[in-house]
């Protein structure tokens, strides 16, 4: 298991992502449409988030991977004054879940150190096929950070080609 440093948690998140990428063959990642977002892009995307009126910011990450987009978004929310963030993450690749959980653990610790709250739900399923938009009990989201898999969906039969 990866040991978190107390000095630079963002660097730790990048290290977690790198270790996961190095653990998978390129062909396997291609078959799943996995092309992970880097820190510069995820930080830029997060910088576009404005402080909403809600007390708790709700983030949707529909292709979570190792969680770098959620991490950047949550940390930006904390930086601009939001002390409560709830993330709902979908990740199709079961093998990515340990790295994703490590990232979310780091985010929780950062929030706790600032007397703030970070909570999350992880779903190991295909966001497109799960159709959470059809569930009337699902709360809306303030932020969606999405780097979806790169492959074609078979609209007629569900699943991807």
Q: What are the residue ranges of the model-derived segments?
A:
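SAM-dependent methyltransferase catalytic region
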Residues: 1-161
């Amino acid at each position: 298991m990866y040991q978190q440093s107390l000095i630079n948690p963002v660097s730790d998140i990048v290290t977690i992502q790198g270790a996961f990428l190095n653990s998978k063959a390129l062909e396997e990642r291609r078959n799943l449409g996995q092309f992970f977002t880097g820190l510069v892009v995820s930080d830029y995307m997060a910088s576009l988030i404005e402080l909403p009126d809600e007390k708790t910011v709700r983030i949707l990450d529909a292709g979570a991977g190792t969680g770098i987009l959620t991490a950047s978004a949550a940390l930006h929310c904390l930086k601009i004054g939001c002390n409560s963030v709830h993330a709902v993450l979908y990740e199709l690749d079961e093998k990515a879940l340990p790295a994703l959980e490590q990232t979310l653990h780091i985010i929780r610790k950062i929030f706790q150190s600032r007397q703030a709250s970070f909570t999350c739900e992880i779903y190991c399923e295909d966001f497109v096929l799960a159709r959470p938009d059809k569930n009337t009990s699902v709360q809306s989201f303030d932020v969606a950070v999405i780097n979806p898999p790169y492959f074609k969906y078979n609209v007629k039969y569900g699943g991807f080609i």
